[in-house]
Amino acid sequence: MKRTVTKSIAIIGEGETEWFYFDSLRVACRYPFKVAPDFPQHSDINHILKLVESYLNKQYDFIVCLFDMDRLYQYPSEMQLYQRAKKEYNKKKYAGKVMFVETNPCTEFWFLLHFLPNVVCRRYESYEQLLPELQKYMPGYEKTKRYFIRTNLYKYLTENGDLERVMSNSEKLCQLCQKSPEDLKAYSEIHKVIKLLNEIKK
């Protein structure tokens, strides 16, 4: 009988939003990954890169790092460090082990894409600018631990929104943004993580 080899995956998020979303996805879909750090907190780029090295040393098969680009655009020194690290982990020796996943401005844009019927190029400078739009579809949404504990994010988004739509819209937006990155349009690469998880689960 063929033994199934479980791949080890660490998903590293900057804050509570990412932690609660991916933890709710992990439970709903029974994915065998770890969401890190263990206790959600706002982490700077240095802390995230230390976690990457820690999981590489532990021989994890895949390490996914989630980044809100609005924060990096605010702090040029962090952006420089981010770009250097991204270039380094793109090298052959890491063989696709480390994945940097961007959302501009923040993870909430990925949530919003579950509800938008068409691919629309928008520009949001910040979470605050995006929030009123998201609250049309997620009334009462707030970036607080209390809200996240009360609301199963993955379940709410897939039951009230459309997962196929968000995957498709997200991919198309990333393609459009590659053509004109200077426009700083809103986009999310989280579809890459969902694809990876689906492939590993097969």
List each model region and its residues.
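Eukaryotic endosomal/vacuolar membrane-trafficking regulators centered on PX-domain-mediated PI3P pathways
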Residues: Y31, Q41-N46
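Short glycine-enriched loops at secondary-structure junctions
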Residues: E14-E18
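Short beta-strand/turn micro-motifs composed of small residues
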Residues: G13, F67
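C-terminal accessory helical subdomains adjacent to catalytic cores in phosphodiester-
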Residues: M1-T6, W19-P37, K50-K58, F62, ...
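Conserved beta-strand elements of the Class I
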Residues: S8-I12
